[in-house]
């Protein structure tokens, strides 16, 4: 029979079977509506207004015959356009179901959300708000200016020729000369835009960036049943040809001070176990490469985790949103993750074993999948992509031993192909860290799910020097799935947080934890608190871990907390004076003063503690960038013995 449909876009007719259900018709309806329509919002009603409108997606199992529709019946459609949120995000679903209708248990869900489905946004350059840094780089010319060549240029001082004219930021000769391996994101954007949009052709503007999409498209216009019941060449992904990514979303990682990283390494020095932390900072322009971007790391927050000698297991992070909000009020955001992979060389000189090198691996397949999930969670909003987002600024840093036995940092990002292949569940980590496995559709029945795994290929240079294409199944090298970044420290450090030592959170395993006693000492509560109208007083409270602990106490009001975070990050004496005269600050000092200093907790020797001076500095390491703070003439083992001796004497008293 024929049904007539009326919407604000016009009228159309569809031929249906009486026993067909409403959701089965959604694909045919989508073909008649604009591409910007959110299919989950399409409603159907028997009246243009005032009728009982129902979402088609919710009418599962309801056939046209059941509701009394006959040949020639007229229905009215309503719908909304896809969300045009400022950053291109969409609300993630709160639950999920398997193909057989069984609810997916929470334990089976991925630990890190993979972001919203890819949806095309109409005129993204009008509705997407990107970061101020991206707006700034968009306005820049980006050309690489060159001086007049005295040997090759024959023109006058005001002339210009091929030897001195400005170069495009993606000029291959310049990048090779400066040994720049990857294009910056904005250089890559200029390159693809110049090829896709040519003003001389007079054609309409097309967003130059397109994110890879390796999943079966749910809104296929062919009219068949949704996958896995139906699939065609229009909705199935094509074969994937992997190649090294020529650009990177972030070019450089800058740590505000050595102490930021050294605090994380000290956990391994004291316990021998690995440690992970999230990087909080901001993004700035990086002038060492054309139109570059750098991540400036101001602090590292260590979430709840189980630490082992050879790995880390993340626990439930209950106050994750609160920490992100505190960072935001300090002008920071989460920019990446860092973790250690260190093994003492047992030489007694602080050296470590080099585990990651050209003959083993630099970033394991498991770490690439981990990085890809977080990059999917934090996409980069951009108005130059048809989906309103492209790639991610999230970086992954690894602290491990270098080829000289010293502790060094390496920075990486998973490629956009890797992120999408993880989203599509095409690849999975291997027990061999240097290779990534391609999933097999043969496992679908055992896993009670349906996946379409496209063909995956990669190109390599074979033993005869020829460039050949290889099938990636069952595994392929991980080098195709990540890009390397540079890193460093400023020559003149000017960190945002200038406070002294304060116990770092979630370190109970090594006997370190923030408490009111430590806070009272830091705020000098016995002497009625610090003078917050002085530079020294402001510097003392400028510690991110201290700010998080004060927030957890719940003593200050929201306005007082906001003022505290502002004072700690801006070091404004007038704001500090205002904070000192608030009622909440006075209450906090009174509580700390009345609580007094608690006696130190007894220290217990841990089997994982090393008595060999793990990671300690030795005379040849004075100029090392990553160094162990000096503890006088005593070694780590002597210091540990003294602490244990002092604890035992106090226990006898």
Curated annotation (Swiss-Prot):
Residues 596-653 are annotated as: Disordered. It holds the Pfam family NPL4. GO terms for biological process: mRNA transport; protein transport; ubiquitin-dependent protein catabolic process. This is Nuclear protein localization protein 4. Belongs to the NPL4 family. Involved in the import of nuclear-targeted proteins into the nucleus and the export of poly(A) RNA out of the nucleus. Has a role in the endoplasmic reticulum-associated degradation (ERAD) pathway. It comes from Phaeosphaeria nodorum (strain SN15 / ATCC MYA-4574 / FGSC 10173) (Glume blotch fungus). GO terms for cellular component: endoplasmic reticulum membrane; nuclear membrane; nucleus; perinuclear region of cytoplasm. Keywords: Cytoplasm, Endoplasmic reticulum, Membrane, mRNA transport, Nucleus, Protein transport, Translocation, Transport.
């Amino acid at each position: 029979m024929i049904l007539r449909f009326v919407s604000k876009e016009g009228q159309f007719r569809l031929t249906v079977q009486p026993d067909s259900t409403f959701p089965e018709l959604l694909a045919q309806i989508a073909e008649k509506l604009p591409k910007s329509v959110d299919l989950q919002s399409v409603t159907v009603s028997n009246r243009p207004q005032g009728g009982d409108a129902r979402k088609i997606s919710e009418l599962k199992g309801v056939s046209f015959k059941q509701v009394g529709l006959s040949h020639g019946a007229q229905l009215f459609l309503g719908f909304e356009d896809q969300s045009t949120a400022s950053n291109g995000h969409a609300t993630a679903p709160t639950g999920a179901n398997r193909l057989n209708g069984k609810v997916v248990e929470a334990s089976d869900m991925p630990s890190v959300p993979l972001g919203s489905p890819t949806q095309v946004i109409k005129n993204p350059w009008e509705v997407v708000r990107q970061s101020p840094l991206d707006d700034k780089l968009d306005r820049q010319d980006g050309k690489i200016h060159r001086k007049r060549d005295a040997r090759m240029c024959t023109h006058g001082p005001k002339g210009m020729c091929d030897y001195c004219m400005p170069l495009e930021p993606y000029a291959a000769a310049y990048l090779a000369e400066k040994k720049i391996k990857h294009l910056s994101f904005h250089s890559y954007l200029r390159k693809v835009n110049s090829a896709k949009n040519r003003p001389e052709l007079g054609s309409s503007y097309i967003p130059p960036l397109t994110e890879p999409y390796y999943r079966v498209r749910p809104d296929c216009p062919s009219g068949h049943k949704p996958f896995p019941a139906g699939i065609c060449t229009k909705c199935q992904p094509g074969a994937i040809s992997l190649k090294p990514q020529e650009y990177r979303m972030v070019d450089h990682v800058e740590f505000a001070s050595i102490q930021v990283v050294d605090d994380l390494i000290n956990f391994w020095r004291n316990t021998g176990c690995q440690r992970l932390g999230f990087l909080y900072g901001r993004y700035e322009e990086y002038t060492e490469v054309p139109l570059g971007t750098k991540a400036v790391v101001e602090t590292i927050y260590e979430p709840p985790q189980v630490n082992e000698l050879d790995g880390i297991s993340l626990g439930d992070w209950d106050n994750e949103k609160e920490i992100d909000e505190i960072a935001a009020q300090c002008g920071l955001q989460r920019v990446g993750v860092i973790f250690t992979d260190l093994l003492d060389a047992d030489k007694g000189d602080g050296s470590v074993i080099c585990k990651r090198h050209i003959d083993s691996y630099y970033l394991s397949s498991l770490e690439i999948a981990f990085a890809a999930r977080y990059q999917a969670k934090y996409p980069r909003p951009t108005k130059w992509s048809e989906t309103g987002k492209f790639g991610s600024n999230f970086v992954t840093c690894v602290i491990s031993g270098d080829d000289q036995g010293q502790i060094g940092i390496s920075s990486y990002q998973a490629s956009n192909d890797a992120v999408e292949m993880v989203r599509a569940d095409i690849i999975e980590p291997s027990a061999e860290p240097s290779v990534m496995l391609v999933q097999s559709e043969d496992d679908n029945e055992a896993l009670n799910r349906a996946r379409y795994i496209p063909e995956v290929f990669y190109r390599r240079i074979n033993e005869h020097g020829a460039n050949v294409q290889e099938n990636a199944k069952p595994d392929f090298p991980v080098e195709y799935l990540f890009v390397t970044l540079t890193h460093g420290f400023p020559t003149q450090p000017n960190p945002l947080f200038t406070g002294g030592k304060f116990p770092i959170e979630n370190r109970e395993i090594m006997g370190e934890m923030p408490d009111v006693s430590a806070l009272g000492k830091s705020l000098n509560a016995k002497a009625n608190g610090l003078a917050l109208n002085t530079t020294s007083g402001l510097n003392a409270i400028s510690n991110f871990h201290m700010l998080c602990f004060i927030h957890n106490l719940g003593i200050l009001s929201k306005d007082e907390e906001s003022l505290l975070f502002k004072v700690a990050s801006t070091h404004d004496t007038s704001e500090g004076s205002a904070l000192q005269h608030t009622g909440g600050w006075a209450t906090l000092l009174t509580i700390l003063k009345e609580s007094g200093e608690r006696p130190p907790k007894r220290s217990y020797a841990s089997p994982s503690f090393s008595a060999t001076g793990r990671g300690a500095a030795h005379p040849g390491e004075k100029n090392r960038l990553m160094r162990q703070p000096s503890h006088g003439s005593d070694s780590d083992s002597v210091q540990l013995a003294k602490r244990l001796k002092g604890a035992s004497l106090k226990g006898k008293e």
